[in-house]
Each structure stands twice: as structure tokens, then as C-alpha cells.
Design a protein with these regions (language model features):
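Outer-membrane beta-barrel transmembrane domain signature of Gram-negative proteins
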Residues: 148-171, 260-269, 344-444, 452-456, ...
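Flexible loop and strand-edge segments within Gram-negative outer membrane beta-barrel domains
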Residues: 98-100, 144-184, 188-192, 201-287, ...
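Short loop/turn motifs that connect adjacent beta-strands in outer-membrane beta-barrel proteins
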Residues: 80-85, 175-176, 191, 221, ...
Length: 510
């Protein structure tokens, strides 16, 4: 299950594998592993991805222990193949458009409906909120500055916004060394019209991805793999006079939904014009228009730089027993962000109707020049694992086994100094054994023993066992008559215990 946010450029998708299993939505997100390491999936260049595997039953996710309760999504990036260098280039252009936007009453319809409602409530003609001259001006559009009639959704929201994706890859190699390299560019424009003359107050997002994957056969039995990938990105957002609990984009749309069509005229000759309630109605005080939440408040620009690096050294141990091999793996992830905030205030104007019927614009408040503020964020984490794998066939009997130790530590800098951080650690021991007879009858036993620093001492470790049995019915002789339209049929039953450590960190200390 996937859902997207409202109109914000590059707003992260929300993905559920096993539905919402917690009161906290963020605690229901699946675990994403990119090349076996927990990393962000949503900012990968799709041209780097070889395949995606979704694990959701208890037997498949129990080995991930306290991280597997919400399912696991395994992402494998592309690797080079032996042969001449292959270069490919792809480009795509897309138009984003709102699927459906609400339609609003115009000023005349609004005023007539409001007055009629008051008449039904027993108001007299002289008690009605909208003056007759205002209603007539709404109908005839004789003075659109003093008596505005604005469709704010049409005025502020574009019909389309451009999105582009460009990518170039090169891959190949010899029998001993193989490589895959990729460069990608992603751009996304915002869906809002920009009326600010001095700076851009729309949304925009640019991302530049890079990747280099190497496979080196050191000997006939020893292989070294190295993956390096990352991205550089910048995101431009309008400065918003927001409300607690709402994102920028939600605040902007709330302003559009709540604004009346007669609350302002938008930008007139470079001036931001609100309506004067004294010309229209005694029942409406502050005539805030749909632009007040973001227009003239400045903008934010966030620059990000992320590096992902991992290596794997694998050794076949056939001299001990056929099918046995061992590997060690290490990974390092680093991210840095810099947010520059330029905040200010643009003055607004109100119409002043003169005795001769002409309209002048009167400035109501003062201008605040754009200020400057910076915020820096840093993050890094380490991951190591060591494992023994065994896989062997004995006639129609196929067995495999895995024993693995893994550990990770994540740093979250806090406070004004980037050197202040509170680490979060994870440690685990994994065991798995599988057996199948003639690729027909299956048995899978798993165990994860994990510890997480998100819990209090004495409560940090847990055992997560699981097992499954399966029967591939399509391999049976009695299924041959239906093989033409049912070539694969499998029955599987599994049971297991999984955990979730995505609670708020260190709540046991409060």
C-alpha cells in the first residue's frame, strides 16, 4: 500500500506492507534494506535498481528481529557483467497535474446565499451582512479592486508542473573485474504560481544521484564487492506563516480553502491588495486573502549531501565442506544538510474609494526586509556483519543454513554543535535453516536474537523464532492436466514472533 502527500515537491511516499500496526504511523513503516544495509529508498535513482523483494510473513521477517514487524523490502542495485562496456542514456519528461480540485462559489453567489440565510433566520433587510451596493458590484464586476471576485484556487495553483529524469549508465568488465556506474538528474517544479518579484517563493526540487558498484575476483574462491552511491540535492520552499502541526503545503491549502472570494484582489500593479471590509460587509473583520499564509514571508533553501558506502569480502570454504562460504561486510552512511532561511514581510494595501468613484490603494503595514538564518544537520551510521552460509544438494534433498552476527550504530547530532550526539545501537544474531525435498516439500526454521538501545536496560534483548512449511502442489503428478493454465501453485503456512523498536528514543529515561 502506498500513499502520497499533497502537492509538495518530492514529498516522501508512505508505504505499508502489513498495514498500520501501531498508533504511531511512523512505527508502521517497513524496513528498507538497500544492498543489505538499512538506507533511504525513496531518493534512489530508479535506473540504479535491479530488483525489489517484499517480505511480509513472520517466517521471512523474523531474522530481522526488532526491525521486522512491519515487513521488509529488499532493494538490490545493478551490477556489472563480463563483456564490453555498455553505455546507456535515458531521459523522461512528465507533467504533474492536480487530479481534482474543489470549485468555490463566486462573490455574488456567496453574498446572496449568506444574506438569504440571514433572512431565513429572521434578520431584517437593514441587518443583512452584505450591502446592496456590494452585491451589485459583485454581479457586474464594476470595481474588481474594491469589490473583488477571486477564484483563489485558479489564481494560485497551476494546471501543470514539469518533472524530468535523466540518467546515464556504463557497465561491463573482464572475467576478474566488473563494474557498474550511474549518474542521474531529477528535477521537479512546484504547482504554485509565483507573483513575488524579488525572489522565487515556489516549490522546487533538484537531485543528482551517483553510483559505482565493483566486483573483483581476488582468487578463484575469494570475491570482493564494493558499492558507493549517494546524492546531492536542493529543495526550495516558500516561507510560510504556519500553524502548529501543519506542514507548509497544508498551511497554504488551508489558506486557499478558508479564504472568501471577496477577501482580496491578489497582486495589482505589483502591490498586494486585500479588500476593505468596510466596503463590503460589517460581519467580516480581517479580510485575509488566500495568499497571506506564504506570500511575502520569504523562502527556505535546503542543500543536502548523502554518501553511502559498503563492501563485502566473501570466501568459499569448500576445503572444509562443499557449499560452505563466509563473508564479512561493512557499511558507512553519512548525510549533511544546510538550510538557509530568508524570512521577511511584504506590506499589503487596501482600496480606498474616492468621492468621484475612483479607487486609490493605501498601504496598511510596513515592510520587513528578508533576514538570514542557517540550520545545519548531520548524521552518520556504521554497520558490520559476519556470516557463514551453507548450501548443498544431496540428490533430491536440498539444504541450506545461515549463521550471522550484525551490529549497527547511528548518530543523531543535536544542539548547536555538530559534535554533540546521542548514538543508538542495534545488535543481532541470526540463524536460519531450510530444507526441501525435490523442490516440492519445504521446511524453513528461523531465529533472531536482537538487542536495541531504544529500550531500558534489562528489556533490550528479545528472541524472535519462526518456522514455515510449504507444499508446491504444481509439482505433483495429479496437477499435470491443469499445468497449461496453472503452472505454479504453492501452499504455505508460517508462524513467528517479530518485534518493533521504532518507539520514541530513550523514553525510558523520562
Amino acid at each position: 500500500q502506498e500513499s502520497r502527500g499533497l502537492g509538495d515537491v518530492y514529498k516522501r511516499q508512505t508505504v505499508y506492507v502489513r498495514g498500520v500496526g501501531s498508533l504511531n504511523e511512523s512505527m508502521s513503516q517497513p524496513l528498507f534494506l538497500v544492498d543489505g544495509v538499512e538506507r533511504s529508498f525513496f531518493q534512489l535513482d530508479p535506473n540504479e535498481v535491479e530488483d525489489i523483494t517484499v517480505l511480509k510473513d513472520a517466517s521471512a521477517t523474523a531474522v530481522f528481529g526488532v526491525r521486522g514487524a512491519n515487513g521488509v523490502i529488499l532493494v538490490t542495485t545493478k551490477r556489472g557483467q563480463e563483456g564490453k562496456a555498455k553505455v546507456s542514456f535515458s531521459t523522461s519528461f512528465a507533467l504533474q497535474t492536480p487530479t481534482r480540485l474543489p470549485e468555490f462559489a463566486n462573490s455574488y453567489e456567496y453574498a446572496m446565499a449568506y444574506n438569504n440565510a440571514q433572512l431565513h433566520d429572521g434578520y431584517t433587510e437593514d441587518q443583512l451582512s452584505f450591502k446592496p451596493e456590494a452585491i451589485e458590484a459583485f454581479r457586474t464586476h464594476s470595481n474588481p479592486i474594491a469589490y473583488p471576485d477571486m477564484d483563489w484556487m485558479d489564481y494560485l495553483v497551476r494546471n501543470t508542473a514539469l518533472q524530468t529524469q535523466h540518467n546515464m549508465t556504463i557497465s561491463g568488465g573482464s572475467q576478474k573485474v566488473r563494474y557498474f556506474a550511474s549518474l542521474g538528474v531529477f528535477t521537479q517544479d512546484g504547482l504554485f504560481n509565483c507573483y513575488q518579484k524579488d525572489y522565487d517563493d515556489n516549490y522546487s526540487y533538484n537531485r543528482y544521484n551517483y553510483r559505482l558498484n565493483l566486483d573483483i575476483d581476488l582468487t578463484k574462491t575469494t570475491q570482493f564487492r564494493m558499492n558507493m552511491g549517494g546524492r546531492v540535492n536542493d529543495k526550495h520552499t516558500p516561507g510560510v506563516d504556519g500553524e502548529s502541526g501543519l506542514s507548509n503545503i497544508e498551511t497554504i491549502f488551508r489558506g486557499i480553502y478558508w479564504a472568501t472570494p471577496f477577501s482580496g484582489s491578489g497582486i495589482v500593479d505589483g502591490k498586494w491588495v486585500w479588500a476593505d471590509a468596510r466596503n463590503i460587509s460589517s460581519s467580516f473583520g480581517d479580510m485575509r486573502d488566500a495568499m497571506y499564509t506564504y506570500y511575502g514571508h520569504g523562502y527556505d533553501v535546503t542543500y543536502g549531501n548523502t554518501l553511502n558506502f559498503d563492501f563485502l569480502l566473501e570466501q568459499k570454504l569448500n576445503f572444509i565442506t562443499k557449499g560452505l562460504k563466509a563473508h564479512v561486510k561493512g557499511a558507512y552512511n553519512s548525510s549533511v544538510s544546510l538550510t538557509k532561511k530568508r524570512r521577511g514581510k511584504t506590506p499589503h494595501y487596501e482600496p480606498l474609494i474616492q468621492p468621484d468613484g475612483s479607487t486609490l490603494l493605501r498601504r496598511v503595514d510596513e515592510e520587513n526586509k528578508l533576514g538570514y538564518e542557517e540550520a545545519i544537520g548531520r548524521g552518520k551510521d556504521w554497520y558490520v556483519e559476519a556470516a557463514l552460509n551453507y548450501k548443498r544438494d544431496f540428490g533430491k534433498h536440498h539444504v541450506s543454513g545461515l549463521v550471522m552476527y550484525n551490529q549497527s550504530i547511528t548518530y543523531y547530532p543535536s544542539g548547536p554543535s555538530a559534535f554533540l550526539s546521542i548514538p543508538r545501537s542495534y545488535i543481532g544474531l541470526v540463524g536460519r535453516a531450510t530444507y526441501d525435498y525435490n523442490t516440492r516439500y519445504l521446511l524453513d526454521v528461523n531465529m533472531g536474537y536482537n538487542g536495541s538501545e531504544n529500550f531500558a536496560p534489562g528489556k533490550r534483548f528479545g528472541l524472535f523464532p519462526a518456522f514455515s512449511v510449504g507444499w508446491i502442489m504444481s509439482e505433483e503428478k495429479f496437477m499435470k492436466p491443469v499445468k497449461n493454465f496453472m503452472d505454479y501453485l504453492k501452499v504455505r503456512v508460517s508462524y513467528g514472533i517479530v518485534g518493533n523498536d521504532r518507539a520514541v528514543s530513550y523514553t525510558h529515561l523520562t
